[in-house]
A protein has these predicted regions:
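Catalytic cores and adjacent binding grooves of peptidoglycan-active enzymes
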Residues: 20-29, 34-38, 77, 152-161, ...
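Active-site acidic/histidine clusters and adjacent loop/turn architecture
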Residues: 80-81, 85-136
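Short, surface-exposed glycine/acidic/tryptophan-bearing loops
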Residues: 98-99, 142-160
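Second-shell loop/turn segments in exported
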Residues: 72, 108-120, 160-166, 209
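N-terminal secretory targeting signals
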Residues: 1-70, 219-237
């Protein structure tokens, strides 16, 4: 049933962005549910649905073939900082360019405290794959490392990013991100935020399951719902 809920959300038309934003006006109560109405054939039907809907990704939906190595090209702008990076994360010999990674780490820094933490290089490789898939488009970073986040968050462990791309629907971005999930040693958590208009992508510790969710709460959605996602373990090298 949960799979059907998420599938239905992804099946909405490209014009669904304004409808998604209108969801912020729906009544969200303290129990983590909201009133959602549909109009079919002139008949209006309303029900209360969970603001947060999540599930482990089915193994059958995960990628079975190895991921191609990305070009390494990255173009990303941190929205809250007004700073951007455009360059390559690899050296000519194919190894990681530590100077480029350091610049990205700085872009990922906590916007409240200014703290910087080394971000998982695998996350930057996924960022490059997204850039390769949407050539010529800049990725906007909504949130990266968050020092003040609870330690169960992947943002706290510097292994997550909230992103969007101008003129690319978040559903299209979400769908492509799903193709990057190989499970097992490279599991991803991927979340869709229709009201705030971004997706979340995180790199998970070995043995953690791939996870998918849709969160209808907005920036003013109140406290987070209990059980909204699984506790994070710090990814290890």
């Amino acid at each position: 049933m949960r799979l059907l809920v998420v599938a239905a959300a992804l099946a909405l038309s490209a014009g669904g962005a304004s409808a998604d934003k209108a969801a912020a006006r729906r009544s969200i109560n303290d129990k983590g549910t909201m009133r959602q109405c549909t109009d079919r054939g002139g008949k209006k039907s309303c029900r209360r649905v969970a603001v947060f809907q999540g599930h482990n990704a089915a193994r059958s939906t995960l990628r079975t073939d190895p991921l191609d190595r990305p070009s390494g090209d990255v173009w990303v702008r941190a929205e809250n900082l007004g700073e951007e990076f455009q360059g390559n994360i690899y050296k000519p010999d194919g190894s990681f360019d530590d100077a480029a990674l350091a610049k990205l780490d700085d872009l990922w820094r906590d916007t409240r405290s200014g703290d910087v933490r080394a971000v998982r290089a695998e996350l930057y490789e996924h960022l490059s794959r997204i850039c390769d898939h949407f050539p010529g488009r800049r990725i906007d970073l909504v949130s990266g490392f968050r020092f003040h986040e609870r330690d169960s968050s992947r943002h706290f462990h510097a292994s997550a990013m909230d992103i969007r791309i101008k003129e690319v629907s978040i559903r299209e971005l979400y769908s492509f991100a799903e193709t990057l999930d190989i499970g097992s040693e490279g599991a991803l958590g991927i979340g869709l935020y229709p009201v705030s208009q971004f997706i979340h992508v995180d790199f998970r510790a070995p043995g953690e399951p791939s996870y998918r969710w849709t969160d209808w709460s907005g920036h003013d959605g109140g406290k987070k719902s209990p059980g909204r996602t699984q506790p994070a373990r710090k990814p290890v090298s």
